[in-house]
Amino acid sequence: VPARVLNYLSDFSAFRPTFCEIANSSTDGLTLDGNSFLPQLHGETGNPREFVYCWYNRDMEPGKTQVTARNQRYKLYKGGKFYDVPNDLQEKQPLVTDSLTPKQVAIKEELQDVLNHYEQFDRLSQVIDGRQ
């Protein structure tokens, strides 16, 4: 595979299906959240992610968990902060809800749906924060 930079979203969940595809190992019967990125490595379109979900708590301290969903351009934090990442790499200026374009409103709603979907699996935050 030639060296190249790919502008596709990917995360850790993509490694298992990619390695299974490389090894010609079936993923039938497995519940996988990620998509193989092997086609993209070969210059094909593949099935890239439309969003990435991230859960982060570096020190496992109560109240310090950061949860985000993002697409190629925008990132939404649980709690509502919404950023135009290429235009605000350090995330210093969250977009103001009243100033969003209709397209940005739709994207924010899509990313909120992602956060809502994955919240049902977020048992670790509940334990860390003492909610369980």
Feature roles, as predicted:
Residues 47-48, 99-103:
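Cytochrome P450 catalytic domain signature, combining two hallmark sequence patches
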Residues 101-125:
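Charge-dense polyanion-binding interfaces
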Residues 128:
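Acidic/polar, compositionally biased interaction segments
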Residues 1-4, 8-87, 118-125:
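C-terminal cap/loop subdomain of S1 sulfatases and analogous C-terminal strand-loop tails that border
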Residues 3-5, 97-100:
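Second-shell loop/turn segments in exported
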